């Protein structure tokens, strides 16, 4: 066991005070200083302040501009919805509880916060997987005469919600459970204990394999094949400056997408697996809190990578924010026209995140 276990909680083992109090009833300032809880609350406020506008704006701009309502963009809207789930279901709750220094909302609140935060995170995770598959299918054309349409896009959305629910619902019905984690003011899946009757061992293995390793393999495979296809298309044309520039742009986008995926999920999954496989080892409350920051901050950098990097989305956002006029339209239009001719086969429009 990695700490002091109580009814539906587990206080981390590294606790120099020797005090153990229920995180549902008492402030946990004996674990870390009140300043750390204030910093956590401020960080959550920052995520809300930035994450809500950029994700809400994504939905609003798509509704306002008909040209954005294409099947390939459906998954990006799904990603924005997932981020809003995390903002309202996770960040607001954590900000409120961190101001009190413990999970003041009780056991029911812990279940709700853990569920919505996990659901939003998993929808986001599987949206990135579906996004990679869609780009691979559209660019690499592994299926001849296949035309990606609205029905395929809707199937992709349904798939993300099914996979997310298959991860977020089981802890509510007895396969594992949601408990306060890290600094004890936010809730997540129980990686810490092997509590009798909850089958935590099998659920953690299931989560690690089906909701981390498999998505990771799929993302690497799809983007790896996509890069190969882009390089082959570039090699088949004359090695002109425009072709090389388009190839570099696509490569840069793919690398950023993969790095964003790893930054989001690798720290959290690695630490959770370490805690689970090293029962009895000592770790402090910050050991699990800090990796969770990376996963939570995806609500900001996912839109930046997958939406703001896309010229069409970016131009429409600027037009909306500037009351119907884009002051940068001429510059971007000129640069787009200059690079369209010879680089059409490696055009980033099929690869970029929209």
Swiss-Prot record:
Residues 334-354 have a biased composition (Low complexity). The record marks 113 as: Plays an important role in the conformation switch to the active conformation. It holds the Pfam family 7tm_1. This is Rhodopsin. A lipid is attached at residues 322-323 (S-palmitoyl cysteine). Glycans are attached at residues 2, 15. Photoreceptor required for image-forming vision at low light intensity. While most salt water fish species use retinal as chromophore, most freshwater fish use 3-dehydroretinal, or a mixture of retinal and 3-dehydroretinal. Light-induced isomerization of 11-cis to all-trans retinal triggers a conformational change that activates signaling via G-proteins. Subsequent receptor phosphorylation mediates displacement of the bound G-protein alpha subunit by arrestin and terminates signaling. GO terms for biological process: absorption of visible light; cellular response to light stimulus; G protein-coupled opsin signaling pathway; G protein-coupled receptor signaling pathway; phototransduction; visual perception. Keywords: Cell projection, Chromophore, Disulfide bond, G-protein coupled receptor, Glycoprotein, Lipoprotein, Membrane, Palmitate, Phosphoprotein, Photoreceptor protein, Receptor, Retinal protein, Sensory transduction, Transducer, Transmembrane, Transmembrane helix, Vision. The chain crosses the membrane at residues 37-61, 74-96, 111-133, 153-173, 203-224, 253-274, 287-308. The keyword Methyltransferase does not apply. Phosphorylated on some or all of the serine and threonine residues present in the C-terminal region. Contains one covalently linked retinal chromophore. The modification N6-(retinylidene)lysine is found at residue 296. It is found in: Membrane; Cell projection, Cilium, Photoreceptor outer segment. Its main location: membrane. Disulfide bonds join 110-187. It is a multi-pass membrane protein. GO terms for cellular component: membrane; photoreceptor disc membrane; photoreceptor outer segment; plasma membrane. A motif ('Ionic lock' involved in activated form stabilization) lies at residues 134-136. Belongs to the G-protein coupled receptor 1 family. Opsin subfamily. The gene is rho. Residues 1-36, 97-110, 174-202, 275-286 are extracellular. Residues 62-73, 134-152, 225-252, 309-354 are cytoplasmic. One of its GO terms (molecular function) is G protein-coupled photoreceptor activity. InterPro entries: GPCR_opsins, GPCR_Rhodpsn, GPCR_Rhodpsn_7TM, Opsin, Retinal_BS, Rhodopsin, Rhodopsin_N. The keyword Ribosomal protein does not apply.
